[in-house]
Swiss-Prot record:
Pfam families: ZapA (PF05164). Residues 71-99 form a coiled coil. HAMAP family: ZapA_type1. GO terms for cellular component: cell division site; cell septum; cytosol; plasma membrane. The gene is zapA. Activator of cell division through the inhibition of FtsZ GTPase activity, therefore promoting FtsZ assembly into bundles of protofilaments necessary for the formation of the division Z ring. It is recruited early at mid-cell but it is not essential for cell division. This is Cell division protein ZapA. It comes from Serratia proteamaculans (strain 568).
């Protein structure tokens, strides 16, 4: 579907953005999250300049995203290593099973 204009409130300001209908709930949740972050920053930093608060919030979000990417990359690397170990274990078990079968076949000949 095509994007529809949606009005959201960010830090007391109205903003109209285009958004596909199926993503409007996610957009609204993101707006709520951003508002909460901005309010929290305003209290913690005592910065009153909205533009500065927005930049600080953007930097914080970028930092969090970078941290999550690192976690995901580490997790994927760990899973790849475990999969390789499992493959080696399975291959070794199959080789041993093949040797056992060969010995049993040789005994019956």
């Amino acid at each position: 579907m095509s994007a529809q204009p949606v009005d959201i409130q960010i830090f007391g300001r109205s903003l109209r953005v285009n958004c596909p209908p199926e993503q409007q709930d996610a957009l609204n949740m993101a707006a709520v999250d951003l508002n909460e972050r901005l309010q929290d920053l305003k209290v913690r930093t005592r910065v009153t300049n909205t533009e500065q608060l927005v930049f600080i919030a953007a930097l914080n979000v970028c930092h969090e995203l970078a941290q999550e990417r690192l976690k995901t990359r580490d997790y994927a690397s760990n899973m790849e290593q475990r999969i390789r170990m499992l493959q080696q274990t399975i291959e070794q078990a199959l080789l041993e099973q093949g040797r056992i079968s060969e010995r049993q076949d040789a005994q019956f000949e």
